[in-house]
Amino acid sequence: MRRACRMIALWILAFPMASQALEKEYVAPPTAPASDQPGWHGSLRVGANVNFTNNRKVVGQQEGNQFQIGAAFDGDIGYLLGEHDWRNSLSLLETFSYGPPVRALMKTADTLRFETAYYYHPVKAPWVGPFVRASVLTAIFEGADYRAAPTLYEVQNETDPATGNPRQETGKRFRLSESFLPTTLRESAGVFLNPYRKEYLDILILVGGGSTQVFADGQYALKDNPATADRIEVMRLSSYVQAGLEAGLALSGAAYGGKIKYRAYGDVLVPFYRSDKAAGDNRNLGDLTNVELGAMLSFKLVEWASLDYILKTLRQPQLAQDWQVQNMLLLTFGYSYSRRQFQPPPPPAAPAP
């Protein structure tokens, strides 16, 4: 009993010591002016996790609560030279669950993201300048909906040629998405503002034009109607292109010498152009505005373990009308490595004669 009490006390004392972020939604400017840190720099983080996840209306992923195991990878590399700042990041998160009543290996989180960005920091005002960035977001594995008993699935926007009614399919498993689908490509260019930059708070503002290409033909999303208990409604997804005004805000910081880290972000795209407008679709700009919001809070328990909470919300009304919401609580065991390669200092001047 005393030993158990001591272990609980040690856990409580270790809990406020925090961790590194698992995901990067933006490629941010460096923590010091570019001219102060020339050369290559990068970091690498790999880990395994035991997670509790709640998914609600996430395209291609299982809904509900699951106990999971998985792996995470997060790496970045960049180059700083004078006013030029080039940054790249790659992140991967995979979690799977297995248990009753389905007793099948199911994926509950599957995210692969790559982003590259270029910032130009003018010498006289390094906190404001032009930027360009591009990113790709996809999933590696096939997505499916599993049920413990045979279930009737009804695809609302597909017609059965034999009956003229919505297509129906019965089974314990319904395929939602193929590998590497849906895939979202994003490009943007504009002006960045970094008006405040301290260890405890870093503010990054992005304003400009952006475009989005979503590849989703032949994929499906659950759109169940609670009033119909005898079936599960499904919607077939379609690919599309959008372009318009884009704005973003990212707040990040650290406390207790970097042992607690936190981050919140928001990104909005108002599409002035969209492809594949269906007949009778009279939605306005507000109805079609894309919104991405998220937050992260990370606690470092020990050097090799962290407790992380991640919230991600996504609104893509041309893909799926409902908000996609994902909550993740991760106990992560991992290893991190970082390296900076600075340019050598200039040789000393020759002594005066």
Regions found by a protein language model. Give the residues of each.
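Surface-exposed strand-loop-strand hairpins of Gram-negative outer-membrane beta-barrel proteins
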Residues: 50-71, 100-104
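Transmembrane beta-strands of outer-membrane beta-barrel proteins
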Residues: 42-46, 86-90, 114, 128-134, ...
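Transmembrane beta-strands of outer-membrane beta-barrel pores
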Residues: 48-54, 81-83, 92-98, 134-145, ...
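Residues on the lipid-exposed face of transmembrane beta-strands in outer-membrane beta-barrel proteins
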Residues: 46-48, 71-79, 114-120, 136, ...
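Outer-membrane beta-barrel transmembrane domain signature
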Residues: 210-296, 300
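Outer-membrane beta-barrel "beta-signal"
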Residues: 325-353
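Residues that define the transmembrane beta-barrel architecture of outer-membrane proteins
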Residues: 65-71, 106-114, 181-187, 233-243, ...
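Repeated loop/turn-to-beta-strand initiation elements of outer-membrane beta-barrel proteins
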Residues: 83-86, 125-129, 199-203, 252-262, ...
